[in-house]
Amino acid sequence: MKIQSILTVLSSVYFLCVSTVAAQSEPELPKGRLLYSDGRHVDCYVISYRAGVATYRTNMKSLNILQTKKPALEAIYFYEPQIFTDAMNLYRAKNYGEAKAKFAECEVSFKSVDSLPDNYATLAGFYKMECSRRSGDLDALSAELEKYRKDGLTRDNHYLQLEVYTFWEAVRLKDWARIDRLATGDSWQGRKVPSELRVQLEYCHALALDELAKEGPKEDSSRWGPVINAYNRVLSADATASIDLVLKAANNLMRIYAEDEGVQLAIKNWKTEHEKVSSVGYQKLMEANTLAQFYKQVGFHEIQPLITDYEKFLNYGQVKVETAAVTKPDAGAEPDVEKAAEAPEAE
């Protein structure tokens, strides 16, 4: 009797351990709501969706696996999973490395429903690519975009961002002439896009013109005019839409001013008998001064301090930018593509 009792206890412990391990290893299923054409709805955990057939459980512990299909099944709405929420919080905090790992995990976990609209596998894959772009890993972005399945996207802004990736791919390849053709072509000229996307377009174009100007004849100083205008368009697109790109544009613009021989001469002759306020170099020095003042007034220097060569522009100027007229950007409040879809277009 004692031996039998011991065996019974051991068997119970064994099956308890097996059940616990199985429960722990079972992947999280997407929680959703099945919407039927007759008005009914059922909250459930979706196992898969293929060819119009949804396979699901009514709860995670249920052993009953059920199926429903079109036309009785009209749509499936998904609740936001915790892993996606965590990933988005990291993303908005600019912690792109950890956010990308979470998005990748979410993408794999919910792959079985990636053919449905607004599924979290497709959304996670999209934001995984955004993490690569924002962190500057264009090689990773290129590889991820090649494998990406976009069918589950429903927002126009997401599809627009996929189109803008064409510019980033050209940046990766350093195909500056192609970027110039894209930016000035019929597809984008005059096209209304949200500020978050407009900043990307203008920055890629400005970067391309910058690189093309470097290849031009040094004696032709006029070649920098279009570059300066292009970087100014980045700054005017929306200073809070994509802070990282705006900072790069501002610093590149000040680099151009600092390297300009006319500006250097204007600095040398500042407040001397040789000063020529009507010269092109003097006018550019005033532009550089205004930009440096703006950079500090809006708080950009708190995110990325001005280097000494650019801060010296503050010593040369006649007009001061009023602090009250400028709103400081919040570096941590950069809107994402999804939120931008809900905002009015800036262009």
Q: Model-predicted segments: where are they?
A:
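Positively charged n-region of N-terminal signal peptides that target proteins for export
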Residues: 1-5
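Bacterial N-terminal signal peptides
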Residues: 8-18
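Compositionally biased alpha-helical segments
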Residues: 23-177, 181-184, 188-196, 200-204, ...
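TPR/TPR-like alpha-solenoid repeats
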Residues: 131, 169, 208, 215, ...
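Flexible helix-coil junctions and inter-repeat linker/turn elements that act as hinges
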Residues: 176, 262-263
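Terminal, low-structured helical/coil segments at or just beyond the last alpha-helical repeat
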Residues: 222-225, 265-347
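Short N-proximal segments of mature Sec-exported proteins
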Residues: 251-257
